[in-house]
Design a protein with these regions (language model features):
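Mid-domain alpha/beta scaffold segments of enzyme catalytic cores
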Residues: 1-61, 67, 86, 145, ...
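Conserved, mostly hydrophobic/aromatic
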Residues: 9, 27, 58, 96, ...
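Short beta-strand segments
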Residues: 10-14, 127-130, 164-166, 201-202
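Active-site metal-binding loops of divalent metal-dependent hydrolases
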Residues: 13, 40, 97, 168-169
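Short, surface-exposed amphipathic charged segments that create phosphate/polyanion-binding patches used
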Residues: 22-27, 107-110, 214
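Catalytic pocket-lining loop regions of alpha/beta-barrel enzymes
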Residues: 34, 45-164
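Short Gly/Pro-enriched loop/turn and capping motifs at secondary-structure junctions
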Residues: 131-133, 169-172
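Mid-to-C-terminal alpha-helical segments outside catalytic/metal-binding sites
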Residues: 152-153, 157-164, 173-214
């Protein structure tokens, strides 16, 4: 409270809680509370009536849901796709490049098709984060070529307006340095022009989380 070093915070609120809206309402008294990260002690069933009711409440409050598909592969993407279609008013930010395991190989066509379907939902954003953590080689490869094919698929389908920069700090320092990660992603986005850089680094986040930035 009173700390102006951050302008937005995504919180943890149990999606299975009967008091979900009460907790969210309390947190939302601080306008820097911008949404909820879908996580918990057990896997979340996004077809569960209470979970869906709580996410509808989140949408009505114009708050965002962060979603982790880590390890979920194509089924995880399809779950997010179905959710985005069932609650079109809910803004969803999917973290860590949709949970892709970066092995340096060309992504599978089935994965690309799942991404294309997901990205057709205009209420879904993709966060370019966690590259080092999701690299199958550790310490992580610090060469853009290892990641480019996947990043290019995300760019093709989400476009300049729905990709968001994420540092994943401090986790990044366990697999590589923050400086090298920033240099890597900047070498990917910079050739697309300054407008794309501005969108990627802050404007898209401002839109997704409704931040007071101009």
């Amino acid at each position: 409270k009173g700390d102006q070093l951050y302008i937005g915070l995504v919180g943890n609120v149990d999606l299975y809680s009967e008091d979900f809206d009460t907790h969210v309402a309390h947190l939302a008294r601080d306008r820097r509370f911008v949404g909820v990260r879908a996580r918990g002690s057990k896997p979340i069933d996004f077809s569960h009536d209470l979970v869906l009711a709580n996410l509808n409440m989140l949408a009505q409050r114009k708050l965002t849901m962060d979603y982790l598909t880590n390890g979920g592969g194509i089924p995880g993407i399809q779950t997010a796709d179905k959710l985005a279609r069932s609650i079109p008013g809910l803004t969803i930010v999917i973290d860590h490049c949709l949970g892709y395991d970066f092995d340096g190989k060309e992504p599978d066509e089935d994965w690309i098709s799942a991404v294309e379907s997901l990205a057709s939902n205009q209420n879904v954003y993709c966060k370019i984060s966690g590259l080092y953590q999701r690299c199958t080689i550790q310490p992580a490869v610090q060469n853009l070529g290892h990641y480019r094919m996947v990043l290019d698929v995300l760019w093709k389908h989400f476009g300049a307006e729905r990709l968001i920069y994420g540092s994943n700090w401090p986790c990044t320092k366990h697999s590589g340095s923050y400086a090298s990660f920033l240099q890597l992603v900047d070498s990917w986005i910079s050739p697309k022009g300054q407008a794309a850089r501005e969108a990627y680094y802050w404007q898209n986040a401002a839109a997704a989380y409704r931040l007071p930035l101009k």
